[in-house]
C-alpha cells in the first residue's frame, strides 16, 4: 500500500484486538461512500486495461449453491483447499446448518458481523485458473502481465504456485470505487485469457449466471452498492492494479498473503 509501516500496524491491530470501528468508519467514508476513491489510471505502477459493463454475481466463503457441481462450493477455492478454515469460517451467518450471506455496512468497513475474518473480506474471482486448469496453466507465462516480475517468475516452474491469488483488482459501480483481492477462479470458465487480460474490453466467455465475468464477496457487494445482497448486478468496471497503487481503505485492514 502507500505506507507499508501503517498497513503492517493495522494488520497487527486487526488480528490482535479486532478492527477499530472508528478507524473503519473513517476509511470507508473516505474511500467508499459517495463514490470517492482513486480515479481510474491515477496510480504510479503498471497500467492495466479497463473492462467495462461487466456482470457480477455474489459469492462467499462457506456458500454451497450446488453440492453436485464440481465448482458449486465455496468451502474451498481453487487456490486453497481449506479456504473455509483459512478465512475463519462462514463469511456470513450459519442458519439451520447452512452458511448464508448477510447485509454489510460502511459503519464497520463492510466486515462480517457474526464471525471474525482471518483473511481479507474484500475478495473476488476471475475466470482464469492457472493452477488447476491445464489450458490456463499452459499459457500463464505468456498472458499474465506480471509473470516476469521477480515475485512471480521464480514460481513459474511450480505448478501449485498461482500468479493470480492475492492480486489486487480495482472495481467501480454506480460511482463507487472499491478494491479486492483474487481468491478463487470463475465463474463458469477457467481459461478466459482474452477477457481477463485482453486490451480490447472483450466480453466474458461464460454464458451462465447472466453471463457474469466475476464473483464478488459480500463486502465488495455492499461497498459497490449492489441492489441485492445475493444477486446478479450489471454495470461493473474493473482493472488489475499493482499493490502499490491500492489506496488505504477497509480493504487494506486485513490483507491476505497466504499462498
Predicted regions and their residues:
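N-terminal secretory signal peptides that target proteins for export/translocation
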Residues: 1-12
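Composition-driven recognition of long, C-terminal low-complexity regions enriched in serine/threonine
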Residues: 5, 32-33
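Bacterial N-terminal signal peptides
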Residues: 19-29
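Secreted/periplasmic proteins
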Residues: 33-259
